Curated annotation (Swiss-Prot):
EC assignment: 2.7.6.3
Keyword Iron in record: no
Disulfide bond sites: none
Organism listed in the record: Methylorubrum extorquens (strain ATCC 14718 / DSM 1338 / JCM 2805 / NCIMB 9133 / AM1) (Methylobacterium extorquens)
Family the UniProt entry places it in: Belongs to the HPPK family.
Protein name: 2-amino-4-hydroxy-6-hydroxymethyldihydropteridine pyrophosphokinase
PANTHER family assigned: 2-AMINO-4-HYDROXY-6-HYDROXYMETHYLDIHYDROPTERIDINE PYROPHOSPHOKINASE
Gene Ontology terms describing biological process: folic acid biosynthetic process; tetrahydrofolate biosynthetic process
Record's catalysed reaction(s): 6-hydroxymethyl-7,8-dihydropterin + ATP = (7,8-dihydropterin-6-yl)methyl diphosphate + AMP + H(+)
Phylogenetic classification of the source organism: Bacteria, Pseudomonadati, Pseudomonadota, Alphaproteobacteria, Hyphomicrobiales
Entry keyword annotation includes Hydrolase: no
GO molecular function: 2-amino-4-hydroxy-6-hydroxymethyldihydropteridine diphosphokinase activity; ATP binding; kinase activity
Gene3D superfamilies: 7,8-Dihydro-6-hydroxymethylpterin-pyrophosphokinase HPPK (3.30.70.560)
NCBIfam families: folK
Length: 158
């Protein structure tokens, strides 16, 4: 099995239930074992900022799926939970991003690994640092990348 890291986000409806539902779907998928989950974090919107706040989390999984197979599973879980893609960086009931996949560097029209923006987004790095602070992405650890960003406005939800 290969270790991969996923970012979860929601800003429509019952955000906590959406994140929990995504993790449940992942855990029920053959070839995926959820090994760690961060707390949920309340975060301001990024990109298109005229929308509600987000709830974000990170998940570590062990998987037998290929990177593209994992992406397809994530997209199918999003659809099962009601995701409709209307505009880039717009509101979403659930978002599941493949952030990193151990030993894989991918760059094609469907998938870029590691995720091209992972080191630029505190809302991704804060929860990821909770479960994998020493994960190396782009030559630096998650902890080092996070130290370069401003995490203000990001609050852990108890």
């Amino acid at each position: 099995m290969t270790r991969a890291y996923l970012g979860l986000g929601s800003n429509i409806g019952d955000k906590a239930a959406m994140l929990a539902g995504a993790v449940e779907h992942l855990a029920a998928t053959p070839g995926i074992r959820v090994v760690a989950r961060s707390a949920d974090y309340r975060t301001p919107p990024w990109g298109d900022t005229d929308q509600d706040w987000f709830l974000n989390a990170a998940v570590a999984i062990d998987t037998e799926l290929t990177p593209h197979g994992l992406l397809e599973v994530c997209l199918s879980i999003e659809a099962a939970l009601g995701r409709v893609r209307e505009r880039r960086w717009g509101p979403r009931v659930i978002d599941i991003d493949v952030l990193a996949y151990e030993g894989a560097q991918v760059s094609d029209e469907r998938l870029v690994l590691p995720h091209r923006f992972v080191r630029e987004r505190a809302f991704v790095l804060v929860p990821l640092a909770e479960i994998a602070p020493d994960l190396v992405i782009g030559g630096e650890t998650v902890r080092e990348a996070l130290a370069k960003l401003d995490p203000s406005g990001i609050e852990r939800v108890e």
